[in-house]
Design a protein with these regions (language model features):
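Positively charged n-region of N-terminal signal peptides that target proteins for export
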Residues: 1-9
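Hydrophobic core
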Residues: 9, 13-17
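Sec-dependent signal peptide cleavage junction
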Residues: 17-28
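Glycine-rich repeat segments that build the extracellular carbohydrate-interaction surface of secreted
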Residues: 39-53, 64-69
Length: 314
């Protein structure tokens, strides 16, 4: 009887171990720059097994899932990650770049990135530069440089800031943010030329500039937005009245808190960008001054709650 029980237990242990062994054999765990480069070039799921210093490229037509595994990937002389294909980032850990004029992630034209985990950091340029399509649902972005935005979605208008990539006719860069923590920068999120921005959730904070600066088409339906500098507004909207810079901002929800315990301005505009544009507000909670002095237009407000009821014209 004891022998039968022993055999049964042994078989049970084998059955339990098989999935674990299969997972271990199938997982591509990399711990060196060369191994990481080879793995992302091939495609599939790749897991960091150590901190790695390397600049990698996801080739066009290649699908890569990068599990940071609690480790840090630091760039080495170029963008830390250049995505030309399809990239999904999961797990805890960091993607960092400290090189001048380089991003932690550069997502180029027609590339797709799904950022579901990890923290992206930079301190000399944009942390994320997007010319393709990015969806963020769980990743965080920290910008330590007040001279650059944390995220730039779209074209700036010069080769250096656009990674020498010209704008294809009829093309839009799209950034969708559903969740995550975003902080710092000249602007935390800048929706640039030909950019389409959709924010439905997340926490956005800045001690230097606006949490969001929109130049083209942006919609905010949720999230928390807060600034601490009395010299800046929570949200800024600019327009040059062109196809690239329409300056169309729509807010249907979210919580917006200005500086100085809610005594600062909620709305501002991009420098030089006062040629047309529109701000439409139908929902959200706004704590701060709704004065739009200097704006080229009056915000259209049909809903929402405001601490400054006097200036929130409905």
């Amino acid at each position: 009887m004891k022998k039968i029980i022993s055999i049964a237990l042994a078989l049970l242990m084998v059955a339990v171990m098989l999935p674990v062994m299969a997972m271990a054999e199938g997982a591509n765990v990399v711990s060196t720059p060369d191994a990481l480069t080879a793995a992302v070039t091939k495609g599939g799921e790749v897991t960091l097994g150590d901190n790695i210093t390397a600049s990698i490229t996801i080739p066009a037509g290649t699908n890569v899932t990068l599990n940071l595994g609690g480790f840090t990937l630091t760039g080495n002389g170029n963008h830390t990650i250049t995505n030309e294909g399809t990239l999904t980032v999961i797990g805890s850990g960091k993607v960092v770049n400290t090189d001048g004029g380089k991003a932690a992630l550069f997502n180029t034209v027609n590339a797709v990135a799904n950022l579901n985990g990890g923290t992206f950091e930079g301190n000399t340029w944009y942390v994320i530069k997007n010319l393709g399509t990015i969806t963020m649902n769980g990743a965080s972005v920290t910008q330590n440089d007040t001279g650059s935005s944390a995220i730039d979605n779209g074209w700036y208008g010069n080769p250096g800031n656009d990674c020498n990539v010209n704008h294809p006719d009829g093309y839009t860069a799209k950034l969708t943010i559903a969740n995550g923590n975003f902080s710092g920068g000249m602007n935390t999120v800048k929706n640039d030329d030909y950019g389409v921005l959709e924010i439905s959730g997340g926490t956005f904070s800045n001690t230097n500039g606006p949490t969001v600066l929109n130049w083209n088409v942006a919609t905010i339906s949720g999230g928390e937005f807060k600034v601490n500098s009395t010299a800046t507004s929570v949200i800024a909207n600019g327009s040059f009245n062109t196809e690239a810079d329409k300056g169309q901002l729509t807010i249907t929800g979210g919580q917006f808190t200005s500086s100085d315990n809610g005594n600062g301005n909620l709305l501002g505009y991009g420098v030089g960008g006062k040629d047309g544009g529109s701000v439409t507000i139908s929902g959200g909670k706004f704590t701060g001054k709704m004065v739009a002095e200097g704006y080229p237009y009056e915000p259209v407000i049909s809903g929402g709650t405001f601490s400054d009821q006097e200036n929130a014209k409905k």
